[in-house]
């Protein structure tokens, strides 16, 4: 038995050492480098590739061109140097959050030299932020920070527990009996409860606007608008699976019908001003459709 335990221990140590070694591999190549003049430089090492292109929402798209899962992305040819590194530098870009991916001999590929990757339902892309403008609101700045909680509520109507993200402003925990207005913020067809806080940078924007006095401290509730889903892919009891659009029940009205369950959960667990004057709802695309229907059916 001692020999078995020792062998298992040594095997575990070997795995750990292998994993640790990866931390010290030289990472000389950088990509999505935002330069001082707001140009951005991309680098990708693929000496055997015949053609490498970059697909990004900063590139002009040719008529009829569709790049993987990236809506509005155009294709730009990259240039290979003698070391097999493909490179491209953009023109100066406006201040914004941008997404992109590489096309290596026609195959969509994530940039391995940029660890910042977002998932938009079933597709992934690298992202970067060009500052010196409105995108400074998307950054983590030295301001008081709110709290983003991943909560679960039970839906009797949908017969499941469902995940929901709730932002509370800086100082909420120390504010005694103070009550806050609440915004219900709904995502689009390709999103889930995580969309507004990843791609949307909602928590950072709220922190910055509240700190600047441009927004009132508020609670923001971000549920999952796909009625058939417990939670975002990888966060539910289904485990890791390949996401796909338009699950059964997505647009059958169930989310709108049982929306009062979300309001009840929020008002039972958070100090909100629970009246029509201090309650708002907004959404993007499908979320706008949901917002309109919920407002018509529940005008309070």
Regions found by a protein language model. Give the residues of each.
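Bacterial Sec-dependent N-terminal signal peptides
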Residues: 1-21
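N-terminal edge beta-strand
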Residues: 20-41
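Non-catalytic cap/lid and distal C-terminal segments of serine-dependent acyl enzymes
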Residues: 34-300
């Amino acid at each position: 038995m001692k020999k078995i335990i020792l062998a298992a221990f040594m095997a575990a140590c070997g795995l750990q050492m292998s994993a640790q070694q990866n931390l010290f591999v030289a990472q000389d190549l950088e990509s999505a480098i935002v330069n001082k003049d707001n140009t951005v430089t991309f680098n990708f090492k693929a000496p055997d590739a015949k053609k490498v292109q970059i697909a990004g929402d900063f590139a002009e798209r040719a008529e009829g061109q569709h790049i993987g899962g990236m809506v509005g992305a155009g294709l730009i040819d990259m240039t290979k140097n003698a070391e097999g590194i493909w490179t491209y530098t953009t023109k100066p870009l406006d201040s914004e959050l941008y997404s992109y991916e590489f096309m290596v001999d026609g195959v969509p590929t994530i940039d391995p030299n940029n660890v910042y990757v977002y998932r938009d339902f079933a597709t992934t892309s690298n992202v970067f932020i060009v500052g010196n403008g409105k995108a400074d609101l998307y950054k983590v700045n030295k301001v008081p920070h709110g709290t983003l909680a991943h909560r679960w509520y039970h839906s009797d109507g949908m017969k499941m527990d469902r995940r929901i993200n709730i932002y509370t402003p800086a100082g909420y925990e120390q504010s005694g009996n103070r009550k806050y207005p609440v915004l219900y913020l709904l995502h689009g067809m390709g999103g889930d409860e995580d969309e507004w806080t990843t791609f949307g940078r909602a928590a950072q924007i709220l922190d910055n606007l509240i700190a600047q006095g441009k927004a009132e401290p508020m609670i923001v509730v971000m549920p999952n608008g796909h009625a058939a889903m417990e939670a975002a892919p990888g966060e539910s009891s289904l485990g890791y699976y390949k996401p796909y659009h338009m699950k059964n029940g997505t647009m059958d009205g169930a989310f709108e019908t049982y929306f009062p369950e979300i309001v009840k959960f929020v008002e039972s667990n958070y100090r909100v001003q629970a009246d029509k004057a201090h309650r708002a709802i907004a959404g993007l695309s499908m979320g706008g459709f949901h917002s309109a229907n919920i407002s018509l059916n529940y005008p309070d």
